Amino acid sequence: MRLLVVAIGRLKNGPERDLAARYRERAVALGKSLGVTACDLTEIPESRARRAADRVAEEAAAILALVPADAAVIACDERGRSDWPSERIAEKIGGWRDAGRGSLVLVIGGADGLHESVRGRADHILAFGAATLPHGLVRVLALEQVYRALTILAGHPYHRGDPEA
């Protein structure tokens, strides 16, 4: 399974970019033993359209053009579900991998959010809480959760989970 993070906008050099790169590199290294062949990041330039609806539609077209037909898709959106613990994310990723899905695409929208066509294509819509977060931070959180999910699948001690479970 190939992992792909598709994000609207480019992170400038700085701590968010460095931390996102660190989690991506960790995911690549650990993923090899789990059948994960890559963890790529594609940054799509923000639309320059005047109207928000036009910007979101243009960005959606660019996002969907990058999503393989057999891909599982997790869309990061503030209107998504925030009740999935890391173990559930790992379970879903492992299930998609074991079912032969060729790719997992994590989508991070732009400042105006995600178009309904992207939300409709998603297998799951994930929120990192009710607060609105900066896109750089969402990228770090998404990549950290990918890495954490892989550690759970590998039985790695990074994720300690619930000691009562």
Swiss-Prot record:
Disulfide bond annotation, renumbered to this chain: none
Main enzyme class? transferase
UniProt xrefs under SUPFAM superfamilies? alpha/beta knot
Q: Which UniProt keywords apply?
A: Cytoplasm, Methyltransferase, rRNA processing, S-adenosyl-L-methionine, Transferase
What chemistry does it catalyse, as a reaction equation?
Answer: pseudouridine(1915) in 23S rRNA + S-adenosyl-L-methionine = N(3)-methylpseudouridine(1915) in 23S rRNA + S-adenosyl-L-homocysteine + H(+)
Predominant subcellular localization, coarse grouping: cytoplasm
Q: What is its EC number?
A: 2.1.1.177
The protein's location, in the record's own words, is: Cytoplasm
Residues annotated as binding S-adenosyl-L-methionine are: G109
UniProt-listed Pfam families: SPOUT_MTase (PF02590)
Molecular function terms from GO: rRNA (pseudouridine-N3-)-methyltransferase activity
* One GO CC term, this protein: cytoplasm
NCBIfam families from the entry? Answer: PRK00103.2-3, PRK00103.2-5
Q: Which family does it belong to?
A: Belongs to the RNA methyltransferase RlmH family.
Query: Subunit structure, briefly?
Result: Homodimer.
Question: What does this chain do?
Answer: Specifically methylates the pseudouridine at position 1915 (m3Psi1915) in 23S rRNA.
Protein name (database record):
Ribosomal RNA large subunit methyltransferase H
Organism name: Methylorubrum populi (strain ATCC BAA-705 / NCIMB 13946 / BJ001)
